[in-house]
From Swiss-Prot:
<dbReference type="InterPro" id="IPR017975">
    <property type="entry name" value="Tubulin_CS"/>
</dbReference>
<keyword id="KW-0493">Microtubule</keyword>
<dbReference type="InterPro" id="IPR013838">
    <property type="entry name" value="Beta-tubulin_BS"/>
</dbReference>
<dbReference type="InterPro" id="IPR018316">
    <property type="entry name" value="Tubulin/FtsZ_2-layer-sand-dom"/>
</dbReference>
<feature type="binding site">
    <location>
        <position position="143"/>
    </location>
    <ligand>
        <name>GTP</name>
    </ligand>
</feature>
<keyword id="KW-0547">Nucleotide-binding</keyword>
<feature type="binding site">
    <location>
        <position position="69"/>
    </location>
    <ligand>
        <name>GTP</name>
    </ligand>
</feature>
<dbReference type="GO" id="GO:0005200">
    <property type="term" value="F:structural constituent of cytoskeleton"/>
</dbReference>
<dbReference type="GO" id="GO:0007017">
    <property type="term" value="P:microtubule-based process"/>
</dbReference>
<dbReference type="InterPro" id="IPR023123">
    <property type="entry name" value="Tubulin_C"/>
</dbReference>
<dbReference type="GO" id="GO:0003924">
    <property type="term" value="F:GTPase activity"/>
</dbReference>
<comment type="similarity">
    <text>Belongs to the tubulin family.</text>
</comment>
<dbReference type="InterPro" id="IPR003008">
    <property type="entry name" value="Tubulin_FtsZ_GTPase"/>
</dbReference>
<dbReference type="InterPro" id="IPR002453">
    <property type="entry name" value="Beta_tubulin"/>
</dbReference>
<dbReference type="GO" id="GO:0005874">
    <property type="term" value="C:microtubule"/>
</dbReference>
<keyword id="KW-0963">Cytoplasm</keyword>
<feature type="binding site">
    <location>
        <position position="69"/>
    </location>
    <ligand>
        <name>Mg(2+)</name>
    </ligand>
</feature>
């Protein structure tokens, strides 16, 4: 019941994805060959959310791995859990998208998209009751952003009533991997605004900061960053996979977190995070993790929640705890920091409790917040986009693949609209209701 098909597009998506499958397999007691080695029935009870049972009791991830070049696939296959995936579910081209959104979305990616949709269809058909798709990709490259958004829009057509959830790695403010990131990101956001139900925005720089400051790792690798992301992805879906006192699923998350259809870009956080040395000095109680969860240093985006206000938030607790305590803490947070929460949505924190904590922890909490400060990120990318687009720098790479300049202008204005929508709701108060009634008619 309630299965999720996980799609990984591009190098970034596949690296996060393969780390994520290590975490999930570990939680369910599945070893790298797909054999169940666990010790508790709870691990098996709803293992089928992410795994399909093949002949001989072998568990196969419901994963679709896509890339436009074979390199990443080879490294996934060579990784610790490389043999667990179905070989047919690796779909790759030979040419690569070369960090070009147009190649991923219109030329190279479009040639591959039919075979990808076939595999997705097969996976969806083997499900009892498909809950939705989760897509891991980055917005700065070519494949994850271009082909990822193409796939999202195709899946949207075919499964209009299923939840479409994306884990999107957004370019960082200071560190840039690619010069054309602003173009690729803006074009992708333009698609995500229309086609996804919930987008978790994750930012490499914020992840580096968490590794440096909180976990005290001197030289964090992408593996460490991806592990952090996996912890969150696993936390978001743990209610589907393990029994709990207060359950939540992808649809409940969307219903409770998205006040207006376009504002579905969330911030993520995870607690407890502490360095190996300081673990024994920290408390592990509901108030402790609640406090750490709302800490700006724990957010996986380079946007400061203090600069915006929470439209809605969701706290997904894991571990044995009393519901009363959780409710008290949530109320407490809202009362103490009421200025950071929008007052025209009362009780805007949703909480859920799952009984099984992650490996090695007594208690953990995953935080998903819809904060207006995420506009900082879009605004930053928009400024970089405008600076390059005004001079038409690098544009020939995109027009050469058949794109039109109009698309860039549309994407830019769509992103600017998004920023101003966030700003409008950040400034809105209860009193001004009369003014908005006329505007809301569109």
């Amino acid at each position: 019941m309630r299965e999720i098909v996980c799609v990984q597009a591009g190098q970034c998506g596949n690296q996060i994805g393969s780390k994520f499958w290590e975490v999930i397999s570990d939680e369910h007691g599945v070893d790298p060959t797909g054999t169940y080695q666990g010790d508790s029935d709870l691990q098996l009870e709803r293992i089928n959310v992410y795994f399909d049972e093949a002949t001989g009791g072998r568990y196969v991830p419901r994963a679709v791995l896509i890339d436009l070049e074979p390199g990443t696939m080879d490294s996934v296959r060579a990784g610790p859990y490389g043999q667990i995936f179905r070989p047919d579910n690796f779909i790759f081209g030979q040419s690569g998208a070369g960090n070009n959104w147009a190649k991923g979305h219109y030329t190279e990616g479009a040639e591959l998209i039919d075979s990808v949709l076939d595999v997705c269809r097969k996976e969806a058909e083997s499900c009892d009751c498909l809950q939705g798709f989760q897509i891991c990709h980055s917005l700065g490259g070519g494949t994850g952003s271009g082909m990822g958004t193409l796939l999202i829009s195709k899946l949207r057509e075919e499964y209009p009533d299923r939840i479409m959830m994306t884990f999107s790695i957004i370019p960082s403010p200071k560190v840039s991997d690619t010069v054309v990131e602003p173009y690729n990101t803006t074009l992708s956001v333009h698609q995500l605004v229309e086609n996804s139900d919930e987008s978790m925005c994750i930012d490499n720089e914020a992840l580096y900061d968490i590794c440096f400051r909180t976990l005290k790792l001197t030289t964090p690798t992408f593996g460490d960053l991806n592990h952090l992301v996996s912890a969150v992805v696993s936390g978001v879906t743990c209610c589907l996979r393990f029994p709990g006192q207060l359950n939540s699923d992808l649809r409940k998350l969307a219903v409770n977190l998205v006040p207006f259809p376009r504002l579905h870009f969330f911030m993520m956080g995870f607690a407890p995070l502490s360095s190996r040395g300081s673990q024994q000095y920290r408390g592990l109680s509901v108030p402790d993790v609640t406090q750490q969860m709302f800490d700006a240093k724990n957010m996986m985006q380079a946007a400061d929640p203090a600069h915006g206000r929470y439209l809605t938030a969701s706290a997904l607790f894991r571990g044995r705890m009393s519901t009363k305590e959780v409710d008290e803490q949530m109320l407490n947070v809202q009362n103490k920091n009421s200025s950071y929460f929008i007052e025209w949505i009362p009780n805007n924190i949703k909480s859920s409790i799952c009984d099984i904590p992650p490996k090695g922890l007594k208690m953990a909490v995953t935080f998903v917040g819809n904060n207006t400060c995420i506009q900082e990120m879009f605004r930053r990318v928009g400024e970089q986009f405008t600076a390059m687009f005004r001079r038409k720098a690098f544009l020939h790479w995109y027009t050469g693949e058949g794109m039109d300049e109009m698309e860039f202008t549309e994407a830019e204005s769509n992103m600017n609209d998004l920023v101003s929508e966030y700003q409008q709701y950040q400034d809105a108060t209860i009193e001004e209701e009369g003014e908005f009634d006329e505007e809301e008619q569109y």
